[in-house]
Amino acid sequence: MNQKHSKDIDARLQALGITLPNAPTSAANYVPFVQSGNLVFISGQLPMVDGKLTCVGQVGAGGDDGVSLEQAIDAARVCALNLISQLKPACDGDLDRVVRVVRLGGFVASDNNFTDQPKVINGASDLMVDIFGDAGRHARAAVGVNTLPLGAAVEVEGLFEIN
């Protein structure tokens, strides 16, 4: 067992008041994750809760279609919860098999003048550290894009090492 994180991730989740959502189904012709050796590559996750997209639009845009920084950070956290929900079956239901979070890739649908993509993706990064401790610290990209699938404001993909 990797001593860099809790011996019991389920207990850590419970202590944090987190209930993992059901893993969202794929929206197109791809699989939710692929395992190669000890690495698990998880497809990009949108801020979906109970099959519904919770955050739509461009971050930093004004008007009714605009998404605030705070809303986007919350959406990134939901994406991270969905990543972990996809990871759990790759670990045969045992998240204690996670050795480390290797990398997150975050995409933020951004207004042309919005440049705080790293702050948005911190919503996902912070959650990984909260859950996995030091093993949750990871390499990362935070990229601004014009649009994302289904009009989502945020998408996060992940790479994890398991034993």
Describe each region flagged by the PLM:
Residues 2-163:
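Short, polar/acidic, helix-capping and beta-turn segments at strand->helix junctions
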